[in-house]
């Protein structure tokens, strides 16, 4: 597999929009041609050569690996609408990373900004650090959040994680902010740390798993959720097995979930009442 390497020369003075920079867009281009591609810097467009040092290992193909090196915390929309191939960010990333992607893989070897994986429909987004508010949620003004694929956050997540999420699997190894899984339509969210206020506010369906285990990490359950009386042991074994698989070899709080007892709550009764909060104890 060929590789395109983009190393940041220096931090930009304004935010940079990297939408359109995907392995398929660079297929068949030489390094000199990639340097002449334009991106938005603030309100103007500039050539990539002004921001990055470009190097190619072979001729780029549609499934090539695109490697960003350096501090990309001011570079937004990395992996926007990605439909295949692999993108690696060797450092922090900006806002909208992995947004609207439908296939492929994005790996961030650091933290990411706001709205990561929003309206994601497929593929895998892995973030080794923390992620900002509204991850796996909707784009501003939209009604549907994450629609498929897998999001893995090995650090902490901000507020409104999974807001209006409709499908897919989202894991957070650490703590999450307020309103996690708010207005959840469907899909699975798993949290390894402590959750903020208003867990599952307005959720209609879907599953939210709390894998922390310690009593101090148990969520505060709103009165619009009620204890589940029916046994769901078989379903829990399937969920636990899938979460361990998605989390990978270093599955941390998601290891051995199937052997733990669970307490389930159904709700949000003020919305539709068919979602579930699963607390592993």
Provide a role label for each language-model segment.
Residues 1-67, 71, 77, 128, ...:
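Intrinsically disordered, low-complexity terminal regions
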Residues 118, 136-138, 219-221:
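Short, charged, surface-exposed secondary-structure boundary motifs
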Residues 132-142:
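Extracellular beta-strand/beta-solenoid scaffold signature
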């Amino acid at each position: 597999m060929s590789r395109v390497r983009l190393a940041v020369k220096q931090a930009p003075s304004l935010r940079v929009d990297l939408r359109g920079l995907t392995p398929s867009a660079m297929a068949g281009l030489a390094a000199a041609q990639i340097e002449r591609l334009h991106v938005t810097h603030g309100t103007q467009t500039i050539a990539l050569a002004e921001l990055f040092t470009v190097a190619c290992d072979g001729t780029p193909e549609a499934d090539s690996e695109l490697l960003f090196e350096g501090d990309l915390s001011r570079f937004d929309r990395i992996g926007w609408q990605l439909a295949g191939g692999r993108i690696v960010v060797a450092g922090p990333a900006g806002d909208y990373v992995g947004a609207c992607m439908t296939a492929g893989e994005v790996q961030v070897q650091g933290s990411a900004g706001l709205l990561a994986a929003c309206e994601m429909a497929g593929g895998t987004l892995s973030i080794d650090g923390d992620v900002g508010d509204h991850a796996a949620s909707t784009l501003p003004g939209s009604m549907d959040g994450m629609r498929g694929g897998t999001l893995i956050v090995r650090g902490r997540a901000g507020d409104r994680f999974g807001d209006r999420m409709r499908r897919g699997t989202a894991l957070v190894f650490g703590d999450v902010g307020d309103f996690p899984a708010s207005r959840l339509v469907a899909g699975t969210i798993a949290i390894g740390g402590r959750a903020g206020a208003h867990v599952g506010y307005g959720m209609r369906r879907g599953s939210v798993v709390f894998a922390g285990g310690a009593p101090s990490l148990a969520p505060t359950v709103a009165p619009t959720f009620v204890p589940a009386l029916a046994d769901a042991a078989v379903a829990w074994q399937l969920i636990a097995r899938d979460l361990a698989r998605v989390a990978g070899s270093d599955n941390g709080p998601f290891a051995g979930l199937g052997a733990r007892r669970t307490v389930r709550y159904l709700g949000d009764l003020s919305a539709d009442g068919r979602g579930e909060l699963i607390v592993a104890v």
